[in-house]
From Swiss-Prot:
The lineage of its organism: Bacteria, Bacillati, Bacillota, Bacilli, Bacillales. Belongs to the tetrahydrofolate dehydrogenase/cyclohydrolase family. Catalyzes the oxidation of 5,10-methylenetetrahydrofolate to 5,10-methenyltetrahydrofolate and then the hydrolysis of 5,10-methenyltetrahydrofolate to 10-formyltetrahydrofolate. Homodimer. This is Bifunctional protein FolD. NADP(+) binds at residues 164-166, 189.
Amino acid sequence: MGEIIDGKKLAKEIQEKVTSEVAELVKQGKKPGLAVVLVGDNQASRTYVRNKQKRTEEAGMKSVLIELPETVTEEKLLKVVEELNEDNTIHGILVQLPLPKHISEEKVIDAISFDKDVDGFHPVNVGNLFIGKDSFVPCTPAGIIELIKSTGTQIEGKRAVVIGRSNIVGKPVAQLLLNENATVTIAHSRTKDLPQVAKEADILVVATGLAKFVKKEYIKPGAIVIDVGMDRDENNKLCGDVDFDDVKEQAGFITPVPGGVGPMTITMLLANTLKAAKRIWKMN
């Protein structure tokens, strides 16, 4: 059976490093701060934001939550972002998506100062990622790279296939793998002979949003399989985009759902917030 990549354990190790670095900064009178803006009453977003707050505080950082009603105007939200851009105690700004339909997500993301864009969605940070310049990388893709490296595998020279082409996961993770000198293919719902394409991968990243979509015939024996999915199966049980039980014998390493990619996302957000603070303080 393939070796399980323990995302919880790795996330804890990275968070401990961040926490000890924050403690050193606090001794010097410097405290990194993360502000999260939550619009409306989406329960999933609320739970996720609460989790982010708890983890931010555990890391010794300042945590600010700004809650706005579903009916808030775009103008008011942009004003809130502008105030956070100018607030010297805040080093990371995150506007929880999705936003209500009457608000342009693009406008809001563009309004966040790219120095404080710890989600890595601002066009400047996206551009920096694509030219290989150090920047804020979206948290889930950053976590995926850490998970792959934790297996002790050298990414350079490997064939990587990413199934999924979203701006949040698929494209950035493909670019990060390219920056690590892998040979990368991006596949998606229109890709012909998808199982054959996937089976060439030494590293397979699956982000389709389709429960148990990837079966054993997609997997090269010994491949690293990273499952980004968070779905429900026919019994309403949490599962990923990879059929774990079908694939686990074939894979060399595999992330479980839950407990694989998920725990890494908030940890990388904390790492990005620390990085933002150090940049603003010119400590890098």
